[in-house]
Structures are given as structure tokens and as C-alpha cells.
A protein has these predicted regions:
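Interaction-mediating elements
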Residues: 1-122
Length: 122
């Protein structure tokens, strides 16, 4: 059960924000084999001047960064996460986000750190 936060400039149209969320979810499904219904996302539109990214870090050419933070249970190996990063980036690129503008960070924890609601069972 990942908890995904997507941070984008508030100039991105609402429909496009939801398309980004769809692309991220599809990337998790493709890259990690998660169920498509295992979807918990928060979209944060921010003023463009509140999104800071070095435009040339690691030789990049960043202009309109989309930050994707994924909080998930530690259960995937590095290869699976690499597949997920690639799938998310490809999905966002299909929605018009340049690969240099995709920034994904994963934080992992254990099942003991989650409460999935009163009826949730692991």
C-alpha cells in the first residue's frame, strides 16, 4: 500500500495533474506488480516559485520539475524499484513531462508502520 505524493506547479491544469497521478499509479503497477486498486495519492499544486530544483544537477536540464514521493513497505529489491522508476518516468513523459523534470524519491518502512483503516487487515 504505497502513499504517493505528487507535487507540481499550480499552473499545471487540474486534468493534467490527474493524468500525472494515473501515470504514477500505472508505473507502480508495471514496475512493482502492485494492484491497480492499491492506490493512495495526494496531489499538491504549489506556486511555481515554491518548487526549487537545481536546473543542471547531474548534467540535467530541469525546467518544470514534478516531484513524486512514494512511501511504501520495504519489500522490493533494487531491480524492481529501477523498473518502477523507469515505468513512472515513461508514463509521465507520455503526459508531457520531460524526463529531466521527473524527480522520484522512495521512503520505505515496515507493515508495523501502517494503519490502513479500521477494516484493514494485512
Amino acid at each position: 500500500m504505497p502513499l504517493v505524493t505528487i507535487e507540481v506547479a499550480d499552473t499545471v491544469p487540474v486534468a493534467k495533474r490527474f493524468a500525472y497521478a494515473e501515470a504514477v499509479n500505472a508505473g507502480l503497477v508495471e514496475g512493482l506488480g502492485m494492484d491497480a486498486e492499491d492506490r493512495f495519492q495526494v496531489i499538491h499544486p504549489l506556486p511555481a516559485d515554491h518548487i526549487v530544483a537545481d536546473p543542471h544537477y547531474l548534467g540535467g536540464d530541469r525546467r518544470d520539475v514534478v516531484y513524486v514521493r512514494i512511501l511504501m513497505v520495504r519489500m522490493y529489491d533494487a531491480e524492481s524499484k529501477a523498473r518502477m522508476f523507469d515505468a513512472v518516468a515513461r508514463g509521465l513523459e507520455a503526459e508531457g513531462v520531460r524526463p529531466d523534470d521527473v524527480f522520484i524519491a522512495v521512503t520505505e518502512n515496515t507493515l508495523d508502520d501502517w494503519y490502513p483503516g479500521a477494516r484493514g487487515e494485512w
